[in-house]
């Protein structure tokens, strides 16, 4: 966040001066990392960029202004995050369709923590003295509808989310499992409602799932994806080799890094014919010489990357815009 509209002169500042421009309680993302993210996104050259952990609409506007040549329309609704990390989009200007964004941040997820359930069972007030019937999404599930003329007649819908992390500082839900499972089930409910309302419209589900939601070795909290929907991971549909799907690396001792896919785009059968062959991949960040960075095998290497998540890229082609 800046005091006023920033100028591109800010891009020439040293890091300490760059940080002083922020008027927020949160630091700016380091200038070099922000520039490297923009470099990667320009190389990918996507029409629609789906983003997690965005520091609000102002941050997204500034990123588009300073780093992306104002080529996109920033699109974000502030969610429920207590850490100021939202989900949002950058949508290329001049595309032959319109878009509409809706939030589900007020939707209940039909979940209380174990101690809250016990308190209500015995008639005690829950934390803070509030009578709580259910929590909401940790962040949000936003609905992006793409349409030609009538917003009620979209030709494609994208659901973007960032499910509950594995952090459990209050020690009330180990690894965030129950909350994440409840959020996933409510996400599926939203998906099914849209399927019913728009039966011939493909609905895509994307975001940071904070766990293994792939069809192989599926974490328990995500199994409903495969029993209740026909959604499939776009990398699975593209038949990308398993070792090429990692979007996050957990650095271990002894210079060992475990690659995991925790970021996903799930597409319905309606979209399978429109997935461009060989277009789906996980983008690897590059150095100043244009060479892909090695897998990070220690924390220094990991922290030097623009982000600890890698972009997932794919192309939908020849989809009727009706």
Q: Predicted regions: what is each one?
A:
Residues 189-204, 210-322:
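Metal-dependent phosphoester-hydrolase catalytic domains
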Residues 103-111, 163-166, 280-290:
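Short, solvent-exposed aromatic-acidic interface loops
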Residues 48, 53-161:
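Structured beta-strand-rich core segments of catalytic domains in phosphoester-bond hydrolases
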Residues 158-179:
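Active-site His/acidic residue clusters
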Residues 1-69, 75-87, 130-132, 297-300, ...:
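N-terminal, active-site-proximal structural segment of metallo-dependent hydrolase catalytic domains
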Residues 33, 37, 56-59, 86, ...:
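Stable alpha-helical elements in mature extracytoplasmic
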Residues 55, 162-164, 209-212:
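Catalytic metal-binding/acid-base residues of hydrolase active sites
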Residues 58-61, 83-85, 167-170, 212-218:
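Extracytoplasmic/secreted cell-surface and envelope-processing proteins
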